[in-house]
Amino acid sequence: MWFVYILLCEDNSLYTGYTNNVSHRFSDHKNGKGGHYTRSHKPIKIIYSEQLPTQSQALKRELEIKSWSRKKKINTLKLVLMEKNS
């Protein structure tokens, strides 16, 4: 299984990535071994993850989410939270 995830960073920015192990990848990001962006924008929390069956699908979804505006990402996350709480 593969996952797309969104991290909240210390400066309130969002980082989107994909992996086959979210907790391990988050640890990499926190320890400066993740993506270039998270070396200068320290991640503090995983705020979203989505499971996909293949690496190819995860990469496509990552690119789709990365193309969204910050506003669209936040609105989508709000909808997901509302669905989980209902």
Predicted region positions:
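GIY-YIG nuclease catalytic motif and its immediate N-terminal context
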Residues: 1-34, 39-52, 56-76, 80-86
